[in-house]
Structures are given as structure tokens and as C-alpha cells.
UniProtKB/Swiss-Prot annotation:
GO biological process: translation
KW Ribosomal protein (keyword) present: yes
Keyword Mitochondrion belongs to the record: no
Biological source species: Cupriavidus taiwanensis (strain DSM 17343 / BCRC 17206 / CCUG 44338 / CIP 107171 / LMG 19424 / R1)
Function according to Swiss-Prot or TrEMBL: This protein is located at the 30S-50S ribosomal subunit interface and may play a role in the structure and function of the aminoacyl-tRNA binding site.
Listed transmembrane segments: none
Pfam families: Ribosomal_L19
Protein family (similarity comment): Belongs to the bacterial ribosomal protein bL19 family.
Alphabetical keyword list: Ribonucleoprotein, Ribosomal protein
Protein name: Large ribosomal subunit protein bL19
GO cellular component: cytosolic large ribosomal subunit
Length: 130
């Protein structure tokens, strides 16, 4: 392991010490809590949408969340280990066969829906036993 990888690994450990990042994938509906500073006030803003892309690059990992806001599609890119992200919550798991869901940009309405990934009873029982 070279020096840069070692430093990045230590930085990731430092940034994730006070928060947990859940496992999520493209197709999942997530709520990203973002720290917003307005003047001297600091508040948390929730951004809910579908993850259409995830970029795994160590410390530079990022993901794109798409939502429909007043009839208009809005996409926002988040850095996974950014201090501006207060937390990430997975609302529902999506069942998709692609890593990048850029085709959702051309779709609207019912054709832009993503099927929910259903967990089998055996997997649910194993998870409950943990």
C-alpha cells in the first residue's frame, strides 16, 4: 500500500468516526440530510430522491440523487465523505440491472418508476437474528 492510499484510508476513518454511511446502490431511494449555512444560522435540509449513479473512488467517492421538484427533474451530486452531509437514510431498495440509471432523465411519470427489491423470507430472518 502506498503512502497516498494510507493517508486516504486514515482520512476516511476520521470522517466516518462520528457518522455511519449505509450501504446503498443505484435505484435506491435515499434521504440525504445536508448541513446548510444561511448567514449565521446552520440547519439541516433533507434531499430525497433516487440514486442514479454511484462513483466509488475511495475518498473521492460520490453519488448522484435525482428527484422531481414541482414537475422538473433536479439532480444533485454529493461527495460521500463530505462534512456537509449530516446523514444518509435508505427509504427503499430499488431492483435495477444497471450501474448508471441515466436513462431516467428521458423518462417521466410511470415509466420512470423503479421496481422495489423484495427481500426473501430467509434473508429477512437472518437479518433479524443479527
Amino acid at each position: 500500500m502506498n503512502l497516498i492510499e494510507q493517508i486516504e484510508k486514515e482520512e476516511i476513518a476520521r470522517l466516518t468516526a462520528n457518522k455511519t454511511i449505509p450501504a446503498f446502490a443505484p435505484g435506491d431511494t435515499v434521504v440525504v440530510s445536508v448541513n446548510v449555512v444561511e448567514g449565521n444560522r446552520k440547519r439541516v435540509q433533507a434531499y430525497e430522491g433516487v440514486v442514479i449513479a454511484k462513483r466509488n473512488r475511495g475518498l473521492n467517492s460520490s453519488f448522484i440523487v435525482r428527484k422531481i421538484s414541482s414537475g422538473e427533474g433536479v439532480e444533485r451530486t454529493f461527495q460521500l465523505y463530505s462534512p456537509l452531509i449530516a446523514g444518509i437514510e435508505v427509504k427503499r431498495r430499488g431492483d435495477v440491472r444497471r450501474a448508471k440509471l441515466y436513462y431516467l432523465r428521458q423518462r417521466s411519470g410511470k415509466s420512470a418508476r423503479i421496481k422495489e427489491k423484495l427481500v426473501s423470507k430467509a434473508a429477512a430472518a437472518a437479518k433479524a437474528a443479527e
